[in-house]
């Protein structure tokens, strides 16, 4: 990152953890001097609506009002993913100021998203840490399996998800997570899509699966409730628009409807 100049212009991405500085629900746009950003460190990380998107290094004790990145989920996917990039990069820079190998300070690498140790005898280079997390929609005939997680207790019902463990494939993680959290066995696993998820540094890897056996028995530390829901019956509160979870649910409900049409 370099010192921002008063006449530098574009969109400005200021972050505090997974929150953004917004003005009337939008990123500030204009010259750096318009928002008193000159002198802070920043860099261009992409283009938004034909203008540069500047990432500003996190400002300690900033008195501006910040809003959760989740509030912008309805943005076009490419725009939301670009904001994800900024949030994840600032998290990476903030948590890797020192070399994890020798403890010396690090510098930002100019040619790529990376930091490098200042110690000439080390020069260890580190790249942004991305923690993959599988997410899966499970179908049984014309029904979908939805769970109310402990963190959403009494609220949203959604698909099952969990982090991939060391030495585990994505597919193995899906089978393990579904079995651990609900006692359900699955089959016909297939890839659906993915989504960057800067809370703070994940990537959601989406799958579809079919029921193979078992009865629901929830892992109470993680899951408050799990049920099979008929696709054409009233559904509980679902994840917000823009999430891969909702896309998985909507796609699975379509598959449920097709299954019922075939049966009749």
Curated annotation (Swiss-Prot):
Its cofactor is Mg(2+); Mn(2+); Zn(2+). A divalent metal cation 2 binds at residue 177. It holds the Pfam family Zn_ribbon_NUD. It is an enzyme of class 3 (hydrolase). Zn(2+) binds at residues 99, 102, 117, 122. GO terms for molecular function: magnesium ion binding; manganese ion binding; NAD+ diphosphatase activity; NADH pyrophosphatase activity; RNA NAD-cap (NMN-forming) hydrolase activity; zinc ion binding. It catalyses: a 5'-end NAD(+)-phospho-ribonucleoside in mRNA + H2O = a 5'-end phospho-adenosine-phospho-ribonucleoside in mRNA + beta-nicotinamide D-ribonucleotide + 2 H(+); NAD(+) + H2O = beta-nicotinamide D-ribonucleotide + AMP + 2 H(+); NADH + H2O = reduced beta-nicotinamide D-ribonucleotide + AMP + 2 H(+). Divalent metal cations. Mg(2+) or Mn(2+). Binds 1 zinc ion per subunit. A divalent metal cation 3 binds at residues 177, 181, 222. It comes from the Bacteria. Residues 128-252 form the Nudix hydrolase domain. GO terms for cellular component: cytosol. GO terms for biological process: NAD catabolic process; NADH metabolic process; NADP catabolic process. Substrate binds at residues 70, 112, 127, 195-202, 245. InterPro entries: NAD-cap_RNA_hydrolase_NudC (IPR050241), NudC-like_C (IPR049734), NUDIX_hydrolase-like_dom_sf (IPR015797), NUDIX_hydrolase_CS (IPR020084), NUDIX_hydrolase_dom (IPR000086), RNA_Hydrolase_NudC (IPR022925), Znr_NADH_PPase (IPR015376). Keywords: Hydrolase, Magnesium, Manganese, Metal-binding, NAD, Zinc. Homodimer. mRNA decapping enzyme that specifically removes the nicotinamide adenine dinucleotide (NAD) cap from a subset of mRNAs by hydrolyzing the diphosphate linkage to produce nicotinamide mononucleotide (NMN) and 5' monophosphate mRNA. The NAD-cap is present at the 5'-end of some mRNAs and stabilizes RNA against 5'-processing. Has preference for mRNAs with a 5'-end purine. Catalyzes the hydrolysis of a broad range of dinucleotide pyrophosphates. Belongs to the Nudix hydrolase family. NudC subfamily. This is NAD-capped RNA hydrolase NudC. It comes from Pasteurella multocida (strain Pm70).
């Amino acid at each position: 990152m370099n010192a921002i100049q008063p006449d530098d212009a574009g969109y400005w991405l200021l972050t505090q953890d997974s929150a953004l500085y917004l003005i009337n629900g939008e990123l500030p746009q204009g010259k750096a001097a318009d928002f008193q950003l000159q002198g802070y460190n920043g860099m261009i990380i992409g283009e938004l609506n034909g203008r540069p998107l500047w990432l500003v290094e996190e400002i300690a004790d900033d008195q501006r009002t910040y809003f959760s990145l989740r509030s912008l989920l309805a943005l076009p996917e490419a725009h939301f993913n670009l904001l994800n990039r900024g949030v994840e990069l600032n998290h990476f820079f903030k948590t890797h100021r020192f070399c994890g190998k020798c403890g010396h300070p690090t510098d930002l690498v100019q040619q790529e998203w990376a930091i490098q140790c200042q110690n000439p005898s080390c020069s260890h280079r580190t790249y942004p840490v991305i923690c993959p997390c599988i997410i899966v929609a499970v179908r049984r005939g014309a029904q979908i399996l939805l769970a109310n997680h402990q963190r959403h207790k009494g609220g949203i019902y959604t698909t099952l998800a969990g982090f991939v463990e060391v030495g585990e494939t994505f597919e193995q993680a899906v089978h393990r997570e579904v079995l651990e959290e609900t006692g359900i066995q699955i089959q016909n696993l297939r890839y659906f899509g993915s989504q960057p998820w800067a809370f703070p540094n994940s990537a959601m890897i989406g799958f579809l699966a079919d029921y193979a056996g078992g009865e629901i028995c929830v892992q109470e530390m993680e899951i408050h409730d799990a049920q099979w829901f008929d696709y054409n019956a009233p559904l509980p509160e679902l994840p917000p628009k823009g999430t891969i979870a909702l896309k998985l649910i909507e796609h699975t409900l379509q598959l449920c409807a097709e299954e019922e049409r075939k049966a009749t």
